[in-house]
């Protein structure tokens, strides 16, 4: 009897939880905010032994895309997001923006095919120095050009030429870096390395014809993007390997 009472209680609580999530989902469907999902590496679980939470299992990534598809989410392009952000056009109901940082080759090897399977758009923020390095870890220029042909749903934008480990980000340093990157990749969108920026950084990007820049991480307002955000300080939501599907869902529907 005790066991059956516990089971009934669990069922009641589960029903209440699902009902509450449903209400939240309906309320947030048309809100003027967009969840920008931030990924890095994608690897099949059988070879994902790094212990780094930024390396997401490919199977987990696919489950997240399945959920987006099931809930009717539209994955925006950068131009769609920019158009909405500037108040020039309306976004589709339940819109998200999927991003990847650093330009890992495993994005090409695993993530792109999964995105294509579910007919979803995404953007990869590439590091110029890695593009020219021809390593096995990051996509080089040749791989990126190949990806553009094979996966027209994938966009490529700037993650700096080589500012990840530059502690002193003065106007001159950022300006020179941006000019170097512009020779490799034609884009007007940018993601700050580690989400770090200052006003000199922002000015240098503006002077190099970047229209929008994205931040990252809890210290950089870990929340959805909204219309009031500065175009050069757009927040993103980090997606990690230890994140449950429920937590992922909450990232999508909570009004924050």
Language model region names:
Residues 73, 120, 210:
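Short phosphate-binding/catalytic loops that engage adenosine nucleotides
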Residues 101-102:
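Noncatalytic alpha-helical scaffolds and linker/capping helices
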Residues 125, 213-215:
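Short beta-strand and adjacent tight-turn residues that come in two discontinuous sequence segments
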